[in-house]
């Protein structure tokens, strides 16, 4: 108290007040506050104060050799007095202006390469078109979106290795570049950035933008591909939207789109094969999208779509723990349930065995055009809050939720028999039977559901069985909301298992995905999809099957030829001949097969009747289960171009045409490849030339294993014996000579010996 009184006394004298309020601050605590640490405490003030000085900048001494002391107007650019406390020069802001106008220029060649993503964005915006602005309520839902157009799909670890290798090649540290894309990008970037003067850190940062997918969980109403997300702030507000068409596409969006199309085609095709899982894996491994192996894309691409996730599960990759039903992604947000089997009777008195989930659970449902929150108990829908773009989308969500609830009134609303089948002609499981039934017609379902009066709740309205909105009444437990339901944000992935029929289950045994969930929507892929698997030949129609089958035989002729003579049954069962069967008229398949197999047997038995071209031509017909009959054919029919076309047993036709002079085969006018051996040449020529260095011992001896082709002989050791298939379908036993000197005489001897061995 005393001190305060004293201070008050002092302040009452005007001179003291002047001293205390006007003199400089030299209190230690304050000085400490503003001078301790490197962090500037008042940057704005510091800047003003510095710039008011004549020489606020310091620079390296070398600057005096590059910049004149005075500019054209005679103003001083740098001071001759050194900066206190360092050996740097004090420089005027005018020096910066001089440098910008007259200083040295660097090459700009690397800028578009390093800042590629920015340059491309400008181009997209320049060529994009902005349409009118519409004012309306925006139903936005948060989705995980790609915010970085034009990137490759490397993991952050892979990208880190590439960046280190490109930007800091001499730094110590192990870098393992294994994937094809890593090696390709590294090579390309090293070439592009030779002599680059842009700061390495900046180059590294920009490379990261180019190599890694960046995702954010953002509210979106409309397009979710990265070229729309980059202009999100321009195209949608709280109550308005602006139509926009991007001025260009980027590869990452194209990869996502093409991957979905390829995965759907593959799952659909695998479903109808004898072993769906094995077929699916074979197709994934032999397919390329835009020149990149599909399995590599699947490992890196985070796209979540039913077919894509089935392919990932088959490859042993982790996928999202949400499950799919009726085209909606369900994520349980609370509650739990146990499963038990229960038999129920439909309105048509058909018995269905369904797996009932007992217990109270809450789910979010997210679809392409509608989202919902579902609360359910055992076989009872408690509440469903739906939001969607239009009446149709809302109806779809309601049907799926009603079926999912397994309420008795759903099962009783079934009229007629449930006998929906999948592509492989197998009956669908009961839940999908119900779903398909009501997706066709849900009138009775909605009418039987029941109606209730509703309270007036902000942002919610009712919906009647005819799908009209109402503020007084609604279908029991169902409301329409203006607000969307956010997609599940977590990027967590779980270990799953997949069975032979492509049903994907989590570790608790819940089915997350099945082929029934794969959309039938067909799009046109943005990138070229190359299906090398024979199972996908039919994707492009009958002509493609025909051409591909013959191309395959010609490409693999060496091994086909051996199997034809040694193990024909195994050859006939090859899956590469499966697609061809769909081209042969059903009634004729067995007869054609029996006829061709008999013909082939005669060729094997009767000397000198081996005919390469004829074997290639007729081989696919022998793959069907044969019927024994005495029928002879001069031509065989295949269904292409909308009608039956004939393949002649002897001679050429528009379907199958072999040109002797060029040794090339054309199928329906398309080139199917060249035969490397001359089908008409006698035994002596090619074989004896190739058999130099081998001694022919006589006819085939099975103890020495299956027949090799001539090309495989080189792997024999000296003195080793082997059976070998020579041009006309005959097999002889040979031994590799122990000495090289006698090779010259071999060709004459070989010719004689072959004749002797055969005869």
Curated annotation (Swiss-Prot):
Predominant location category: virion
Protein name per UniProt: Polymerase basic protein 2
Pfam families: Flu_PB2_1st, Flu_PB2_2nd, Flu_PB2_3rd, Flu_PB2_4th, Flu_PB2_5th, Flu_PB2_6th, Flu_PB2_7th
Provenance organism: Influenza A virus (strain A/Swine/Tennessee/24/1977 H1N1)
Keywords recorded for this protein, A-Z: Cap snatching, Eukaryotic host gene expression shutoff by virus, Eukaryotic host transcription shutoff by virus, Host gene expression shutoff by virus, Host mitochondrion, Host nucleus, Host-virus interaction, Inhibition of host innate immune response by virus, Inhibition of host MAVS by virus, Inhibition of host RLR pathway by virus, Inhibition of host RNA polymerase II by virus, mRNA capping, mRNA processing, Viral immunoevasion, Viral transcription, Virion
Site feature Mammalian adaptation, where: 627
Gene: PB2
Any one GO CC term of the record: virion component
Function in brief: Plays an essential role in transcription initiation and cap-stealing mechanism, in which cellular capped pre-mRNAs are used to generate primers for viral transcription. Recognizes and binds the 7-methylguanosine-containing cap of the target pre-RNA which is subsequently cleaved after 10-13 nucleotides by the viral protein PA. Plays a role in the initiation of the viral genome replication and modulates the activity of the ribonucleoprotein (RNP) complex.
Family: Belongs to the influenza viruses PB2 family.
Any one biological process term the GO annotation gives: 7-methylguanosine mRNA capping
Listed InterPro entries: Flu_PB2_2nd, Flu_PB2_6th, Flu_PB2_C, Flu_PB2_CAP-bd, Flu_PB2_middle, Flu_PB2_N, INV_PB2, PB2_helical
Gene Ontology molecular function: RNA binding; RNA-directed RNA polymerase activity
Subunit structure: Influenza RNA polymerase is composed of three subunits: PB1, PB2 and PA. Interacts (via N-terminus) with PB1 (via C-terminus). Interacts with nucleoprotein NP (via N-terminus). Interacts (via N-terminus) with host MAVS (via N-terminus); this interaction inhibits host innate immune response.
Subcellular location(s) per record: Virion; Host nucleus; Host mitochondrion
Motif, Nuclear localization signal: chain positions: 736-739
Coiled-coil residue windows: none
